[in-house]
């Protein structure tokens, strides 16, 4: 096989997830170039192999191949575009550890790449420069470079392997800085790119994770659940990808929000095994399980270990919620104030909404409903603008509590009804339970939705799932799902207990 064909084979194998074949092809091409006395081309093969290993999380072999490529360039002393890749590999590990001081390294690499008119190296240097600028706090400049990177990617100016890497890194970066608009736009672009190449494995798995995160926020939880499961299957390999932990974490998040608590715990545990810290999801799960004694130390441990300010923003809202549940209002105030301080440094509607909600919740706990109300309304408007129905419903619940505290029972009822309607549509079982606990009532049967109340009545009448499905014109699978929700909401485990609940609460006469 010709050496150029070996290089094409290596890239194709990488794109379809055949890592062993990819490595073998790069190594073979590397050896051919060495035998031909072309160390620069041999070094390039070493760098491409290292790039795939680096983004799969195999850092030790990646460093080994970079060292070999660097030695070849040093021996040849050639002025070539491969020198740009060597410079970037020197800075890459430090950049991904959060060190912004490597920015000049990527400027130098970009200059070399531009001089040789190498589109791949130029794009990658620009991506790393944008990342470094954002780490320096120069977010506007950094995101400008990121947009430029994505223009070259969507215009098909770079190789497929680097295009996929750029998509995933840019979306991850947008999510890290809470730039939801860009994250949504580039996720949709990644979906289209993956759909046009159905054989992709690494990028399709990452694409599913990113898409799942967007769908979760938008409230499309059933589709998000399916995508999360597919992402776990795709990324599990062999070989397993380093983003497998994120896929399991995302699966756990959706299961937790739907009240599938046992399944969520298993998913969080699998995320941990795959290398992803399951916080704050695990702490919020413990809270939903009524295990405040486990939730408090877990979220505190996560905060103690996390120094990065943006990463702390992912933990602080959960900390506020858990601390308020534990009646530690002073500590919740400290966490909310820290969140507000960080959010003030970033132009992010998402962060502003998190801050307004958390601060409003603390003010409510402090007994200042009048001050809490405008913050909670601001949060609710932001969540609506962001098309985040679950977050909006949670804000409306607190708005209702604030209105009630101010003596406006009619407005409180409107907010409670709006919140419950949205939560029922989402299937947010734990939040429906919380709503019933906080308000002392609901529209149908305690925390149950109208359809769940209908199913409960038929269960109390002694009817089987098949008969219930026929009477309500729904599938037996849907009946089973409603029963699972009923058991979770009412904290029961059998049809007999469900029947007893129906009689005890006057639903059956």
Stretches found by the model and what they are:
Residues 260, 266, 291-292, 322-330, ...:
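N-terminal regulatory/sensing modules of transcriptional regulators
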Residues 1-2, 6, 19, 36-39, ...:
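Inter-repeat boundary and helix-capping residues of tandem alpha-helical solenoids
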Residues 22, 45, 125, 130, ...:
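Hydrophobic packing within well-folded, soluble alpha/beta domains
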Residues 27-38, 51, 67-75, 107-118, ...:
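Amphipathic alpha-helical segments of tetratricopeptide repeats
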Residues 1-28, 32-36, 41-45, 105, ...:
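Extended alpha-helical scaffolding segments used for macromolecular assembly and cargo binding
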Residues 365, 374, 437-493, 497-509:
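Helix-turn-helix DNA-binding segment
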Residues 7-19, 43-59, 82-99, 121-139, ...:
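Tandem amphipathic alpha-helical repeat scaffolds
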């Amino acid at each position: 096989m010709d050496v150029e064909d070996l290089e094409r084979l290596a890239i194709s194998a990488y794109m379809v997830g055949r890592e062993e074949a990819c490595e073998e092809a790069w190594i073979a091409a590397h050896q051919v170039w060495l035998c031909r006395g072309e160390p620069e081309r041999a070094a390039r093969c070493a760098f491409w192999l290292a790039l795939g290993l680096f983004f799969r999380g195999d850092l030790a072999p990646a460093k080994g191949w970079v060292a070999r490529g660097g030695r070849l360039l040093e021996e040849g002393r050639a002025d070539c575009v491969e020198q740009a890749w060597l410079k970037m590999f020197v800075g890459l590990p430090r950049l991904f550890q959060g060190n912004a001081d490597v920015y000049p390294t990527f400027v130098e690499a970009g200059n070399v790449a531009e001089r040789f008119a190498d589109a791949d190296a130029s794009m990658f240097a620009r991506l790393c420069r944008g990342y470094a600028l954002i780490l320096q706090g120069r977010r506007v400049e950094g995101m400008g470079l990121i947009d430029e990177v994505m223009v070259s990617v969507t215009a098909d100016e770079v190789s497929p392997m680097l295009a996929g890497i750029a998509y995933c890194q840019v979306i991850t970066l947008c999510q890290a800085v809470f730039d939801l608009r860009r994250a949504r736009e580039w996720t949709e672009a990644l979906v289209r790119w993956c759909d046009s190449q159905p054989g992709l494995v690494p990028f399709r798995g990452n694409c599913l994770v990113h898409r799942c995160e967007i769908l979760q926020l938008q409230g499309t939880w059933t589709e998000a659940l399916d995508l999360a499961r597919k992402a776990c299957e795709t990324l599990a390999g062999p070989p397993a990808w380093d983003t497998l932990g994120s896929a399991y974490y995302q699966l756990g998040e959706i299961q937790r929000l739907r009240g599938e608590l046992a399944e969520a715990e298993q998913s969080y545990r699998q995320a941990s095994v795959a290398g992803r810290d399951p916080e704050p999801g695990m702490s919020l799960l413990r809270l939903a399980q009524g295990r405040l004694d486990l939730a408090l130390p877990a979220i505190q441990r996560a905060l103690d270990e996390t120094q990065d300010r943006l990463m702390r923003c992912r933990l602080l809202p959960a900390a506020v919620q858990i601390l308020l549940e534990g009646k530690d209002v002073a500590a919740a105030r400290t966490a909310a104030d820290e969140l507000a301080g960080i959010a003030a440094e970033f132009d992010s509607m998402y962060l502003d909404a998190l801050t307004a909600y958390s601060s409003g919740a603390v003010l409510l706990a402090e007994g200042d409903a009048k001050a809490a109300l405008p913050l909670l309304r601001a949060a609710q408007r932001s969540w609506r603008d962001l098309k985040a129905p679950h977050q909006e419903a949670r804000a409306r619940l607190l708005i209702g509590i604030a209105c009630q505290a101010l003596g406006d029972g009619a407005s409180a009822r409107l907010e409670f009804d709006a919140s419950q309607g949205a939560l029922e549509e989402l299937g947010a079982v734990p939040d429906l339970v919380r709503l019933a606990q906080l308000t002392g009532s609901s529209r149908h049967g305690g925390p149950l939705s109208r359809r769940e109340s209908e199913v409960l009545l038929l269960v109390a009448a002694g009817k089987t799932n098949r008969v219930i499905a026929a009477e309500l014109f729904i599938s037996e699978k849907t009946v089973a799902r409603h029963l699972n929700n009923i058991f979770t909401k009412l904290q029961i485990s059998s049809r007999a207990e469900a029947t007893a609940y129906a009689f005890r609460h006057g639903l059956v006469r």
